Amino acid sequence: MIDPVATVIIVNFNSGDRLAKCLACLEAQTRRDFETIVIDNQSSDGSQAAAQASALPAVLIEAGANLGFAAANNRAAARARGAWLIFLNPDAYAAPDWVEKLLEGAARYPFADAFGSTQIDALDPAKLDGAGDVFHVFGVAYRGGYGRPVEQAPPDGECFAPCAAAAMYRRDRFEALGGFDESFFCYGEDVDLGFRLRLDGGRAVQLAGAKVFHEGSGITGRHSGFTVYHGNRNRIWATYKNMPAEIYWPLAPFRFAVDLYLLVRHSLLGNAAAYLKALRDGYCGLAALRARRRAIQKGRRIGLRELARALTWSPLKVMRRESDLRPVAGDRRAQENPSRATPVPK
């Protein structure tokens, strides 16, 4: 049997009708030399049945428990046969040429180890959901360009990390880095992996032409206590694990100021309890991460200056949620035009 070029992995948990729509979009792809694995985290709504009913051949793995996004993806990746791993959320609906554009990007930028997609808001297609993950030196990560007009989607560029709602990684690199950190459970594990990839000398490219329509926390809730807790606990862990001491310690007062600002913000949104629990568990959990931090920093293959150039320093970019892509070094080809209209999957 000839192995597929890529493996698309979808983690499902009570996604309702979204999984069926997600699979229908994959079935309509212009390039079909990929396999699909759906791993279900013990859904109670029967949504996993869509994997068996779909016209798209899909392998269904019943996890038997809610493993979380990170561990479920790792388990499915261990079953993958493709040289590329493509992670896709069940609330992300791929444009018909999405896989084709991802693999074209891999051919165009053979030095890159990971690729991100242009994420368009599925509920408001005039707006972006994200164009590459940004990591600020104050320990804040966000989807670049979130909420901005879709016409402002950037051309191809080097991103700090791709958003794993719709991203592609070299399987050998993913495995060598140990995959997603399963202690994160959900949220921020893609930024953590991207940070580790960056420290290991890897590079990630955001592809303008690879488009998906993403609901964005459509299953867990954008401002739910679950999202607030895991997102903030995990940003503390990702920063501590990966940020070199020369940057981490001098900027500690600024991270504390960010913590206070976010406390006020989440209090106004009615999520103070979830946020305070995230701070408590985040900082109390740092002791257990010391060995991992030492191993990551000991194995760092890039210089401090190179890392500093990849990080975002401007507070205004965070406040405006601007994308922060770098020109792709050595790219001699014409880049994709991100403003070209793509119909929303029905």
Per-region residue spans from a language model:
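Short, acidic, metal-binding catalytic loop of nucleotide-sugar glycosyltransferases
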Residues: A24-D33
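Short beta-strand/loop segment that forms part of the nucleotide-sugar
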Residues: F34-Q42, I61-A63
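Glycine-rich, basic loop-to-helix element that forms the pyrophosphate-binding segment
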Residues: E62-A80, P90
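Short aromatic/hydrophobic "clamp" motif used to bind/position activated sugar donors
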Residues: L85
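Conserved donor NDP-sugar-binding/catalytic core segment of glycosyltransferases
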Residues: A92-V140
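A short, conserved alpha-helix in the catalytic core of glycosyltransferases
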Residues: L102, F160-K211
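A recurrent flexible, glycine/aromatic-enriched loop bordering the glycosyltransferase active site
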Residues: L128, V137-A141, R148-D172, C186, ...
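Active-site-adjacent helix/loop segment of glycosyltransferases
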Residues: D200, A204-R309
